[in-house]
């Protein structure tokens, strides 16, 4: 499993914080950030890498998380969530089988961002009664 991470200019500093944290937790990271990328481009780049392997997960950081989230939801087969708290990050894996989260660097601080990332990458899909919803999401787009 790889954690694919990317950020636009507004999210660069926080991306480095999250990246360093996850690397210290021994996760394999792929950073697709390129200088001057808009949140649209970076979200598409993260999604492309995430979709290469079923186990891959993605994290995109921009100013507010909303722009990247809107892009991610336009990608066929991508289930994404905009999160700004640890519980939502964890639960979106468990209940929605989300493969990507977006965060806003102007909304969350360093420690919260690390905890959000940790909750997301450590979350496991629960299946069962949640599969009906996931099937509905996967039929869309």
From Swiss-Prot:
It comes from the Bacteria. One of its GO terms (biological process) is D-allose catabolic process. Its EC number is 5.3.1.26. One of its GO terms (molecular function) is galactose-6-phosphate isomerase activity. It is an enzyme of class 5 (isomerase). Pathway: Carbohydrate metabolism; D-galactose 6-phosphate degradation; D-tagatose 6-phosphate from D-galactose 6-phosphate: step 1/1. Keywords: Isomerase, Lactose metabolism. It catalyses: aldehydo-D-galactose 6-phosphate = keto-D-tagatose 6-phosphate. It holds the Pfam family LacAB_rpiB. HAMAP family: LacA. Belongs to the LacAB/RpiB family. Heteromultimeric protein consisting of LacA and LacB. This is Galactose-6-phosphate isomerase subunit LacA. It comes from Streptococcus pneumoniae (strain ATCC 700669 / Spain 23F-1). The gene is lacA.
């Amino acid at each position: 499993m790889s954690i694919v991470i990317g950020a636009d200019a507004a999210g660069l500093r926080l991306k480095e914080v999250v990246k360093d944290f996850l690397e210290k937790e021994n996760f394999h990271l792929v950073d697709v950030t390129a200088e001057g990328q808009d949140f649209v481009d970076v979200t598409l780049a993260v999604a492309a890498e995430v979709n290469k392997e079923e186990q891959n997960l993605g994290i995109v950081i921009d100013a507010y998380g909303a722009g990247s989230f809107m892009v991610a939801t336009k990608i066929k087969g991508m289930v994404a969530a905009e999160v700004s708290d640890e519980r939502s990050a964890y639960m979106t894996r468990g209940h929605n089988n989300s493969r990507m989260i977006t965060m806003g660097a102007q909304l969350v601080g360093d420690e919260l961002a690390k905890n959000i990332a940790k909750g997301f990458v450590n979350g496991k899909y629960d299946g069962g009664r949640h599969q009906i919803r996931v099937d509905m999401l996967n039929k869309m787009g």
